[in-house]
């Protein structure tokens, strides 16, 4: 008798971590952070393209992009390199330690620099990754006329974008969307499904 507890999962490829695999089970306990039909994540490469196009269009403005320190930061670095972006990417100090660990494990992220080593007011069309909370604190005010973005599945919700005063919402998530939750449940073929982190009405 097998019980499978999913934890957070996604089915899309991510070169910075092990891939998803199906496991047949009798009871499947799945997370459902984005367990509503309105959540259908776009392709990662299309969201990265939006970021790169914004850099070209707003070539005198630094791009401050909010990412979580564990996993999301390194995934975005990897996706940017896969998209052909080979410029130095700047990281808030809070992102450096975990990123250095990923590098020590062989994850390819290209050239990065700690923003604490720089005169940030001189940065123009560069990409600067930081924790989401840093977008609106004292640290962010050191940049001149930045474009602010957040990388999150929640950027699918206009109210969230407006609430956080974000100019560049990027919908890249480490959680399965509605369709992938349904597909995973079907493929695991459990007798019973229990759901966490979701909306009861779903």
Identify the residue ranges that each predicted region occupies.
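Residue-level preference for the first positions of well-ordered beta-strands
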Residues: 27, 61-64, 88, 125-128, ...
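Proline-aspartate-enriched helix->loop->beta-strand connector
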Residues: 184-195
